[in-house]
Amino acid sequence: MFEVFMYPVSGIMKFWHWLIGSFVDESTAWLVSIILLVITVRGIVSPLNWMALRSGRISVLMRPESTRINEQMNHAETTEEMAELIQKQQDLSKSYNYKPAAGCIPPLITIPAFLGLYQVILRMSNIEQGSSTVGMLDAADVAAFRETTYSGVPITDFARDHGDLLNPIVIAAIAFTLANSIISVVRSFLTTQFDQKVNRRIFIIIGILLIVAPILLWYLAHSGPLPVAIILYWGWAYLFTLVQTIVFEILLHKRYPLTEEVHEMRRESIRAWRQKDKKPALSKEEKKRVNRLRLEARKYLRSNNQQEGPTASE
């Protein structure tokens, strides 16, 4: 199933090895190709990560006014009134240049890259059991890779057999992960509405992962079937992610600082959660009425836009 991921990963590694092979020895070239694989993959998804982060911050900045509009929608009585509020919400998004980003895209690239590298290394570790080629790597590439060492240890060996040697890298990877997670938790704390159950639970899950992730990484490195090359990939990948996170946080702080109104909404949500002060919810009948009005209002707006279109072009 994961074989398909081997081809782009092995292709990237082969390209970088070919490019730098003239300047360094064979073993160093393969080690550097792993680092450049990290930079290539993370570099591709960095703009997407920024788009997702920027989109999330803008939605937070819009929250106070957007919340007021949503509350007004719950009390709208006519289609025209609802249409006016929907238009107001659309204008708000335009004023902030809000473009929802596909936050799920980066994992769809980084996870296959990791799985592809894992399959490449694992198959080269057990090459005697199958073909002499792996992905886009031919027999000569595989043989050279298998002879590549890190501090005298073949990078196709399992990391659990060389714990003392790799502990500094594992500890560094865990430190990078912890620092990155702490930054994410602080960012989430400053933007989470704690009186909303879903948002509160997501924040709690992030906090739990802050504790579980380092333990899991340590366990996998010392007990799992992970080659040395994967540990090297981890170390550089988490370092890249931490640097990226710090840069993005600086950009967010300078370009999209949180307003006092946003902070006050968060503080009020914490007070409401602690005091168990729940806002009165709409009844089923009211929800149906509001949803019906929204549907009618959208049709009303589309109809008006279609009528105004030819006139605007003339």
List the model feature ranges, each with a label:
Residues 1-32, 137-162:
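Interfacial loop/helix-cap signal at membrane boundaries in integral membrane proteins
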Residues 1-7, 230, 244, 269:
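Extended, helix-rich structural scaffolds rather than catalytic motifs
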Residues 15, 47, 51-54, 58, ...:
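Membrane-spanning helices that line or support transport/gating and their immediate boundary helices
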Residues 21-51, 103, 158-171:
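Hydrophobic alpha-helical transmembrane segments
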Residues 44-114, 179-216:
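Membrane-interface amphipathic helices and adjacent TM-edge segments
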Residues 115, 119-126, 130-263:
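Hydrophobic alpha-helical transmembrane segments and adjacent short intramembrane/lumenal linkers
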Residues 243-314:
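Cytosolic, positively charged, low-complexity intrinsically disordered regions immediately flanking transmembrane
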